[in-house]
């Protein structure tokens, strides 16, 4: 089993648990160049989203595949979720290690008001 397959298996297992519990979750996806975040309901409806592909976020940071960009995305998605009245979520890291950009996004979202 290669690295990507193992990550996808971990993600599927944890995602199934979140859906069974009926929790709203903050889903992240990380590529070498960008990072994406979405607040998704248990039914699969996207309530808020942010990514380094967006022009507003891309222009505020130097580079899109670094910790500073992840912090900007975390803050933006938390503010957009707060506008919709969402405060408590589960953090779905999609099988990625809780380190580096993933941790930076989570910490920024917590500082901006999301609870998880």
Swiss-Prot record:
Protein name: Large ribosomal subunit protein uL18
Subunit structure as annotated in this protein's UniProt entry: Part of the 50S ribosomal subunit; part of the 5S rRNA/L5/L18/L25 subcomplex. Contacts the 5S and 23S rRNAs.
GO CC annotations on file: cytosolic large ribosomal subunit
GO biological process: translation
Encoding gene per record: rplR
Classification lineage: Bacteria, Pseudomonadati, Pseudomonadota, Gammaproteobacteria, Alteromonadales
Annotated function: This is one of the proteins that bind and probably mediate the attachment of the 5S RNA into the large ribosomal subunit, where it forms part of the central protuberance.
Pfam family for this entry, one: Ribosomal_L18p
PANTHER family: 39S RIBOSOMAL PROTEIN L18, MITOCHONDRIAL, LARGE RIBOSOMAL SUBUNIT PROTEIN UL18M
Similarity comment text for this entry: Belongs to the universal ribosomal protein uL18 family.
GO molecular function, one term: structural constituent of ribosome
Keyword list, A-Z: Ribonucleoprotein, Ribosomal protein, RNA-binding, rRNA-binding
Origin superkingdom: Bacteria
């Amino acid at each position: 089993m290669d690295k990507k397959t193992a990550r996808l298996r971990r993600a599927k297992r944890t995602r199934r648990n979140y859906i069974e519990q009926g929790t709203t979750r903050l889903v992240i996806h990380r590529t070498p160049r960008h990072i994406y975040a979405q607040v998704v309901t248990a039914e699969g409806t996207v309530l808020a989203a942010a990514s380094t592909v967006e022009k507003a976020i891309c222009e505020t940071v130097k580079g899109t595949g670094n910790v500073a960009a992840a912090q900007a995305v975390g803050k933006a998605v938390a503010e957009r979720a707060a506008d919709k009245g969402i405060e408590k979520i589960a953090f779905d890291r999609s099988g990625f290690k809780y380190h580096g950009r993933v941790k930076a996004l989570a910490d920024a979202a917590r500082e901006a008001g999301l609870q998880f």
